[in-house]
């Protein structure tokens, strides 16, 4: 899980979602998981 100021899609399988007021990226590739922080 990467914590970044700006989250972006890395590949076409990444999805930007909101969980508990946080913007997150979930993907089939675990390296692409990101959270805004």
Curated annotation (Swiss-Prot):
Q: Which UniProt keywords apply?
A: Ribonucleoprotein, Ribosomal protein
- InterPro entries, alphabetized: Ribosomal_bL36 (IPR000473), Ribosomal_bL36_sp (IPR035977)
* One Gene Ontology term of the molecular function aspect: structural constituent of ribosome
GO BP, sorted A to Z: translation
GO annotations of cellular component type: cytoplasm; ribonucleoprotein complex; ribosome
Q: Which cysteines are disulphide-bonded? A: none
Top-rank taxon of the source lineage equals Bacteria
The record ties this protein, via HAMAP family, to: Ribosomal_bL36
Q: Which NCBIfam families does its entry note?
A: rpmJ_bact (TIGR01022)
Query: What family does the entry list?
Result: Belongs to the bacterial ribosomal protein bL36 family.
Could you tell me what this protein is called? Large ribosomal subunit protein bL36
Origin organism is: Nostoc sp. (strain PCC 7120 / SAG 25.82 / UTEX 2576)
């Amino acid at each position: 899980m990467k914590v970044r100021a700006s989250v972006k899609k890395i590949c076409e399988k990444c999805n930007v979602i909101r969980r508990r007021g946080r913007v997150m990226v979930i993907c089939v590739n675990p390296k692409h998981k990101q959270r805004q922080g």
